Structures are given as structure tokens and as C-alpha cells.
Amino acid sequence: TIGIFDYLLNEDIKNIERKKNDPIVIAGNLSSVKAKYLKKLLPEKNIKINLYGKGLDFDLPKNITYKGTFLPDNIAGKIDGGYGLVWDGNDIDKCSGVYGKYLKYNNPHKASLYIVSQLPLIVPSTSAISKFVLKNKIGLTINSIKDIDNKLKQIKEEDYKEMQKNLRILSKKLLSGTYLKNVVNEIIKDWS
């Protein structure tokens, strides 16, 4: 199983109070080449989305708000939302295309961003990061973006608070370089 990347910052992130009904966050490269699925998000859904990143090259439906571009060192404490979506590719039904299929093998940087931002993750069930998310109880998995509305309705307030608690713990680990230290210690142990 895949682990997670640390997310080192010069400043500490305070505990952030999130609400489960706040908009879903999508951060990263927003161009239609990498995130073609964004063009297929339906405006009539009850889901509100906040976009962060560069490359936005199409008009947005009313339920999607573009929040701008931030440097990786500055965005973590500024993200406004209730969940962070990890999804790439051409389609909303599955992670397709080169970028979508890559999520089966990749640990996306945005997952670490969402964790240090204390945002519960929504990830594809086929992604390499899905087992990490479920094991650490920091989010949920979906087969299709169309599943999000129903999945979120099933999340109880106490479930969301547990995810928040787990994210605060994990956030501190990522911010302090715990996962890199673990890898280095494993390498040293193997060479001893």
C-alpha cells in the first residue's frame, strides 16, 4: 500500500473547524487537459465546489466558485471547504485518461495538502491512496463523482468530527516530516 507525502511549511497550521456541509474543495491544475472532468460537473447538483489552482480555461456553473491561485506554502490555512476531492481525468464516472489512471499508482500531492488543511478526503475507490484514507479514517471513497451527494448524506456529524480529529493528528505528522523520517529510518535499518 502507498503511504503519504509530508507537507513541510514554515508556519504551523492551527486546528481548523470545518463543517460537513461546506463546499467541496478541488485544488491543483484546473486545465481541461488534466482535469477534463471539471467541465462535466452538473450545475443542478446540490453540491457546492470551491476551486483553487491555475489553468482554469472554461466557464463555471453557478455551484462552482473559483477562489484563485496560491503558492503551496500559502494555501493550506486558507482553503475554505468541508471536504477535499482527489480526482483526475476525463470523466466523472471513473478516473479515466492518462491522469485519471495514474491515480491508481500515485500518491497525489493534493492529498497531503488536504490533510494538513484538515479537510476530510473524497478519493476514488480505485486510487492508490484509498486504503490510506480508509485505514486512517480521514475520508471516504467513491466510484464516481455522481456518488458524492449520496455518500455525504450518509456521513453523520459524529463521523465527520472523528475524521477531523484524525486529520488534526495526521496533519501534525505531515507538517513535522514524520513520513520521510520513517522512510529514512527503514533504509538505515535495512543497511545495518
Tell where the protein language model's regions lie, with residue ranges.
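Active-site-proximal region of nucleotide-activated glycan assembly enzymes
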Residues: 1
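Conserved catalytic-core segment of nucleotide-activated headgroup transferases in glycan assembly
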Residues: 5-80
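A charged, aromatic-enriched C-terminal amphipathic alpha-helix characteristic of glycosyltransferases
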Residues: 15-16, 143-146, 150, 157-192
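Short alpha-helical
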Residues: 32-33, 128, 147
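Anion (oxyanion) recognition and catalysis
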Residues: 43, 115, 134
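Nucleotide-sugar-dependent
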Residues: 79-117, 123-131
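A short acidic/histidine/glycine-rich donor-binding loop in glycosyltransferase catalytic cores
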Residues: 136-142
